[in-house]
Amino acid sequence: TAIGLQGRHNPTVRRAAELVSSGRIGRPLNARVVAQTLAHGPEMPIQYDYCNKLASGANHLTIVGGHTLDLVEAVLAPISEIDARTETRWPKVKLTETGGESAREVPDWVGVLGKTRSGAVFTADIEAGVQPEKVRFSFEVRGSEGWLTLTSTHPYGVQAGDLTLTSNVAFAPPEKAVASGGIGEPAINVGELYAHLIRDMHAGAHTTPGFEHALHNARLIEAVRQAAERGERQHLID
């Protein structure tokens, strides 16, 4: 099985995770994430109005938040503690086609302060409704012996595009993405997910994150929601 957390399969993300796990930047100390998207802003096409409704389960926290926190875990380590705040900055959303309004029942801004099992602490500013030309993703990791940064500017968020890796330590260039043959940047990470699954099938292995990982991500998102709602730190135990 495979699930839709494709960002962790990006070759550049995998190289960043390798730099951390191999100790090239020393002991991971802290990280800072800024994750922005054009989506879930003050105006939306009517076909996406379901993303404003809590019952749909598809919203800024579950989509952009879920992908962002999964990348934190892919590069650093599983998250063990979470403090959070959420805000709905646009409680009334304009529907593009009709000019009418729809009530937004879900957050469009998420702030997370967390800690991973490796001991590294991190902050994540997860922001919706950013102008497309200003959208950015930045994931800065500081270690005891060095640093690395992952960046992207895809308007629909980090899960939808390629990334750039920089570091003060030398590293081999990331592998070429399997979906780099002109079929569009949004396919890069999904293509890598399928390639990983195919390798598993050929080898009789089960290394591609599946339903158990999806459950973990859902619990992570729920921990963010609970931390924001209760004002209490949440401890994650799988």
Q: Which role does the model predict for each range below?
A:
Residues 105-106, 120, 133-136:
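Glycine/proline-rich active-site loop of Rossmann-fold NAD(P)-dependent oxidoreductases
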Residues 215, 229-238:
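C-terminal lid/capping helical subdomain adjacent to the catalytic/cofactor pocket in oxidative enzymes
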Residues 13, 68-69, 190-195, 221:
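A general structural signal for well-ordered alpha-helical segments in protein cores
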Residues 220-230:
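Short arginine-rich
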Residues 81, 91-103, 111-116, 139-212, ...:
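C-terminal glycine/acidic-rich active-site capping loop/insertion
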Residues 66, 125-134:
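Glycine-rich phosphate/pyrophosphate-binding beta-alpha loops
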Residues 1-3, 124, 150:
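Hydrophobic residues in well-ordered beta-strands that form the structural core
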Residues 2, 7-103, 231:
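Predominantly a Rossmann-like dinucleotide-binding segment in NAD(P)-dependent oxidoreductases
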